[in-house]
Structures are given as C-alpha cells and as structure tokens.
Amino acid sequence: YMQYGNGRIVSHFFVMLFLTAPKIIFDVLNAFLFVFFIAFVLRITASKKSFSILLFFAVPTLFWLYMPAYGQVFLWLTGCINYMWSYLFALLFLNIYISLLRGKSLLDKKWKLISFCLFTFLFGNYSENVSFSVIFTGFLLMCVTMYQHKTIRKYLSYVFPIICGAAGYLVLLLSPSGSAKFSDNPVSY
C-alpha cells in the first residue's frame, strides 16, 4: 500500500478494517471515541477538575456549529478516522506533555514509557496534517518544562517519545508514494 497509495499505514489500516466490518461496529466505536474526544478537550482546557454537564454539551454543539464539513470530520467513516481520530490521538499525545508542564509525570513507569513510545511512532505515521505539528508542540512543551525547572536530566525520558513520533512521521513522509509528492517528476498512476 505504501508503494502506490500513501504512507498513512495506520489510519488506512483502520479505514480498510472498518469498511469490511459491519457498519454498526464502526458506528458504536466512533460514538464512544467522539464522547472521549469531547471529554479530553474538556480535560485539557479545564483549570479545575470539576465536571460541568453544560460544558460537556456546549463543546460538541460548538463543534457542530463552527466546524467546516462537520459530517465529513465526525460522521463519515474515512473522514473521521483520518481527522477526528487523529485529533483525539493528538490530544492524548499532548496530554502527557501538558501534564508534565503542570507538574504531573504520567510516564513514571518503564512500561508506560515503552507503550507511549509505540503509540507516538504509530501517531507519527497517522496523518501528515496533524502529526508533525503536534509532535513539535510536544517538543516545545517539554523544552518549556525543562527551562522552568532548570533541569534536563529529570525529563530526558520524555525525549524518546518525541524521537519515536518523528521516526513514524518520517516513515509516512519518505514512503515511495509520499516522497513522490515532493519530487520533480511525480508518478501518476
């Protein structure tokens, strides 16, 4: 697939998987992930840990009102796997570095770090549009945290997920079909 399609191995794996499965499976999973996405938006942006039912309903309403092509991003199978799911994965990624900036280490065990490195490699390969900017933002948040605490050694383990994410992004970008976009003689099929 990387040779003739594109390098989005992870996202297009899910697209192909759910296109072959009964539609109800995708619909239920996507509804769950949408609720999880809204909850994560609230978690990252909220200054308090209290839950507001008003905000929980206001956020999706605002997405519905102000998101261009709402149906293509949140409802259409291919669109939501490529866009909404990538936004959710971006929030999961950034949550680690935002929590670190707020003084809470979420990668305190080795298995968590290894799992997060695997996740960031897959996330780096997920979407050209989202992956680079989010990984770079995570890097900047890590640098700000190191600067605030005047230490590098304590936060050095947080560099590994950034490297894994960059490696996943490079696999996406340097795939034969992906690199053809940047060549002087693009391949046409």
Language-model regions, residue ranges each:
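Transmembrane catalytic cores of multi-pass membrane glycosyltransferases
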Residues: 1-24, 28, 77, 111, ...
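Membrane-interface micro-motifs in multi-pass membrane enzymes
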Residues: 8, 55-98, 127
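Membrane-embedded alpha-helical segments of multi-pass membrane proteins
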Residues: 28-36, 80-93, 135-136
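Transmembrane-helix motifs of polytopic, lipid-linked glycan transferases
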Residues: 31-54, 92
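Transmembrane alpha-helices and membrane-interface helical segments
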Residues: 39-43, 92-99, 137-146
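Membrane-interface helix-boundary motifs at transmembrane edges
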Residues: 42-52, 101-109, 145-156
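Short hydrophobic alpha-helices at membrane interfaces in multi-pass membrane enzymes
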Residues: 99-122
